[in-house]
A protein has these predicted regions:
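Beta-strand-rich binding/interaction modules
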Residues: 398-404
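Structured loops at beta-to-helix junctions and adjacent beta-edge loops in soluble globular domains
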Residues: 19, 23, 116, 355, ...
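Short strand-turn-strand beta-turns centered on an Asx-Gly dipeptide
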Residues: 383, 407-410
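Short, solvent-exposed S/T- and G/P-enriched segments that are highly enriched in secreted/extracellular
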Residues: 413-418
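Single conserved hydrophobic/aromatic residue that forms the stacking wall/gate
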Residues: 2-9, 13
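Active-site core of glycosidic bond-cleaving carbohydrate-active enzymes
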Residues: 45-60, 68-69, 110, 120-389, ...
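C-terminal beta-strand-rich structural cap/linker in extracellular carbohydrate-active enzymes
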Residues: 419-448
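N-terminal core-entry segment
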Residues: 14-58, 62, 69-140
């Protein structure tokens, strides 16, 4: 890139890096005292207590980013979760100033805990952390969990007192992902019985798939799919999204989702349609559907990983195209420089990762799907004293397509890099070009 272009993009990057750190916030006095969710004063002894966890948003990229930029704080965040559980009988969902708002859904403290544990971060009590995860996931009275366990999904015709909007479909998918995270942590800890239980629960997303419509679809307590379903409608059954946008919320089992729809070719057609099926010109979109590319809504979190799913079916060049498009068009160095709500750092964390050339589709997998880098050189200085480097000497606004990849000087054909490669201080070098050249595993089916 020329110097002027690099300076401009550098300003945008620094802006997003700053924004990614606006939450969570320290929530204790200088002596460690803080007011807990049980309305009592507690003491953070030897650690810092944090609050303002917008976890439905930030588990996706912001918290994985913290594991590299500030792992010592991640340790204290997990300790904050454990303390919150001990004082409130469940992990935080969206806590603010020490109180639970229950503003969003899922039990997404779980993936943050699991990611930290699987990466070996900190000295938090893993037994206490896992127990808190399991207890929260088994709290039958909370937001449909009892029905989720009984039926394998949350029925749309049964509501609870937590939320006037049912969001049944979204809860089912979010719970399934969180259950996978519990299983991964339990497996690592040698607790196979817990792992088996939650791996089974993590497949509950399949119970909402309707092969007749090829979408996830709300079901009632008798097992019947809702009538009159339209995937581009925004309804009370789907959280801040429509059927197109939430269909892909199976980050833990993309291969299973591919099989569910009938194979890679069908999946490719559906994924391509996600970006090319545009809302009607007179459609009144909700305020959170911003940054639209077809049905893809970059202004809201459920879409954030979807761009990177082309890698899983051999269409890497489409991931590269759309990632570059979003970075160049939807992030700007101006007061209204985002296409949606910052959401406590998640919107910017997407950019911080993507500008480095990769993104955590599954935030607890230790794998980062390759997109397209933004700068000729980026370095990540790690707390273990090593430096992870990304090189793309000839990248510019036209040269957005990866022609070849090397890791530590050796040819590399995978569609992702790993946590271990990052922490080892590896050097990843991309040769960029202006025309697509698909890398990695390519299937032989007809392309849409």
């Amino acid at each position: 890139r020329d110097a002027q272009e690099s300076r401009g993009l550098g300003d945008v990057y620094k802006r997003q890096l700053y924004h990614s750190m606006i939450a969570p916030t320290i929530y204790n006095d200088v002596d460690g005292a803080y007011y807990g969710p049980d309305k009592k004063v507690h003491q953070a002894d030897g650690w810092v207590n944090y609050s303002t966890f917008s976890l439905w948003d930030t588990y996706r990229a912001a918290h994985p980013l913290f594991t590299y930029t500030e792992p010592e704080r991640v340790n204290d965040m997990i300790k904050s979760f454990i303390a919150f559980y001990e004082q409130n009988n469940r992990l935080p969902v969206w806590n603010f100033y020490g109180s639970e708002t229950d503003m969003m859904i899922g039990y997404h403290a779980v993936p943050v805990i699991a990611d930290a544990y699987l990466k070996g971060i900190g000295d938090f009590d893993a037994e206490k952390a896992l127990n808190a995860c399991v207890a929260t996931a088994n709290l039958d009275s909370y937001r449909g969990i009892g029905l989720y366990k009984e039926l394998g999904y949350i029925p749309y015709n049964v509501t609870d007192h937590y939320n006037a909007e049912n969001w049944s479909l979204s809860k089912t998918l979010e719970y399934a992902f969180d259950d996978y995270c519990i299983a991964e942590m339990a497996k690592k800890m040698g607790k196979q019985d817990i792992a088996d239980t939650f791996y089974k629960r993590s497949r509950n997303y399949r119970n909402l798939y309707n092969p007749e419509t090829s979408f996830m679809q709300p079901r009632d307590d008798k097992g019947r799919f809702i009538k009159g379903f339209k995937a581009d409608d925004y309804t009370p059954h789907i959280c801040e999204s429509n059927g197109w946008q939430y269909f892909w919320s199976v980050q833990h089992d993309i291969d299973g989702l591919i099989d569910l729809v009938g194979g890679k070719n069908r999946f490719a057609e559906k994924l391509d349609s996600m970006f090319t099926y545009h809302p009607a010109a007179d459609a009144e979109l909700p305020l959170f559907s911003t940054g639209m590319i077809g049905q893809y809504a970059h202004g809201n979190e459920p879409s954030h990983h979807v761009i990177y799913l082309f890698n899983s079916i051999g269409f890497n060049e489409r991931t590269q195209y759309y990632v570059a498009k979003v970075m160049n068009e939807l992030y700007k160095n101006e007061p209204a420089g985002l296409c949606g709500n910052e959401d406590c750092g998640q919107m910017s964390a997407w950019y911080v990762f993507s500008a480095m050339g990769f993104y955590p589709v599954n935030p607890v997998s230790g794998k980062y799907e390759i997109g397209t880098p933004l700068f000729p050189e980026m370095q990540l200085h790690l707390t273990n004293g090593k430096t992870f480097t990304v090189l793309a000497p000839n990248v510019n606004k036209k040269n957005i397509y990866i022609q070849s990849t090397k890791v530590n000087g050796h040819p590399y054909d995978k569609t992702y890099i790993t946590h271990e490669q990052i922490m080892s201080g590896a050097t990843v070098e991309f040769e960029m070009g202006s025309t697509p050249k698909t890398i990695g595993v390519i299937f032989e089916e007809k392309r849409p």
